[in-house]
């Protein structure tokens, strides 16, 4: 199976090919999909829909912390580059109360500075992370176990 299929099977979004995935009762999972088709909202609207209690200042600060400028923040998500769209999705994820993150290629489309900021944020994360990534230089020093799904091996 593919990596995205594996993650979606774990989450129960699609049925497992065999066996079953059973999640614990106290999991609060945040999921970062590799590709998502953006809607018509601006970045501000995207975050406000997710966090309606935030003030405009808090929404703008959260988006800025993810590397988006005022120009980006006021633009529709669909006109942004792939990296900028990913930053909006990451903004939602890091501001959600979770104890498990499932990340499907979160570094795709990100520039070096954004990758560094993401790695810093993930290193401070207190929960568990299941990360699909093809960039050893990104996950090196961040992860405790590496699973090679193509060879079905666990690397230490």
Regions found by a protein language model. Name each.
Residues 1-156:
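ABC ATP-binding cassette signature C-motif
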């Amino acid at each position: 199976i593919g990596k995205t299929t594996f993650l979606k099977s774990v989450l129960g979004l699609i049925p497992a090919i065999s066996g079953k995935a059973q999640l614990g009762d106290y999991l609060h999972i945040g999921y970062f999909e590799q590709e998502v088709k953006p809607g018509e909202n601006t970045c501000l609207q995207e975050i406000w829909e997710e966090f309606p209690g935030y003030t405009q200042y808090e929404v703008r600060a959260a988006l800025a912390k993810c590397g988006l400028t005022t120009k980006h923040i006021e633009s529709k998500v669909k006109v942004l580059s792939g990296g900028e769209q990913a930053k909006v999705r990451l903004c939602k994820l890091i501001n959600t109360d979770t104890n498990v993150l499932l990340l499907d290629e979160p570094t795709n489309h990100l520039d070096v500075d954004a990758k560094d900021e993401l790695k810093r944020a993930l290193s401070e994360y207190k929960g568990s992370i299941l990360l699909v990534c093809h960039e050893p230089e990104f996950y090196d020093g961040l992860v405790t176990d590496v699973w090679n799904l193509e060879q079905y091996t666990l690397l230490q």
